[in-house]
Amino acid sequence: MADSENQGPAEPSQAAAAAEAAAEEVMAEGGAQGGDCDSAAGDPDSAAGEMAEEPQTPAENAPKPKNDFIESLPNSVKCRVLALKKLQKRCDKIEAKFDKEFQALEKKYNDIYKPLLAKIQELTGEMEGCAWTLEGEEEEEEEYEDDEEEGEEEEEEEEAAAEAAAGAKHDDAHAEMPDDAKK
């Protein structure tokens, strides 16, 4: 597109004329089946003929409700809408081609990587412990071990206190020492 087309005309009549010219250009390039864009938009047979030639997605196959709004638009606007739809179809075809080529390229390079990944797997093998660790890992392991040891010591103290309490109940009630005195 030229820069003058991107800027847009200053008057609405110029905009309509520019849009109509663009629509006619698209119709001529797109291989319209003769006639002007008004007859192509209003003729359901020509639209069905175009749709039968192109493969359709399930969304395109779904029945489309008649919209009174579109039918109430002027013919020049209908022509622009038709031109935009055709341009969108072209864009969709290009995008589909890109996706297919991209998938083929991914597959090609995945096949190239397979031997390398197999060698890496062979060298690394299964997860094995190694003789060295990173400094951060050592600190984390020490903290974890300290927490476990503290937890075990607390459990042992609680068990000892529970046993002492059970033994004290069996002994004379006056012989008990307060908890503060035991420590």
Swiss-Prot record:
Major localization class: nucleus
Region (Disordered): 1-71, 135-183
GO cellular component: nucleus
Keyword entries, A-Z: Coiled coil, Nucleus
InterPro entries associated with the record: NAP-like_sf, NAP_family
Keyword Coiled coil: yes
Domain of life: Eukaryota
Biased composition regions of type Acidic residues, renumbered to the chain: 135-161
UniProt key word Coiled coil: yes
Coiled coil: 81-107
Record's subcellular location: Nucleus
Transmembrane segments: none
Biased composition (Basic and acidic residues): 168-183
Signal sequence range: none
Amino acid composition bias (Low complexity), ranges on this chain: 7-21, 28-49
The family this protein is said to belong to: Belongs to the nucleosome assembly protein (NAP) family.
Alphabetical list of PANTHER family matching this protein: TESTIS-SPECIFIC Y-ENCODED PROTEIN (PTHR11875)
Identification of the protein by name: Nucleosome assembly protein 1-like 5
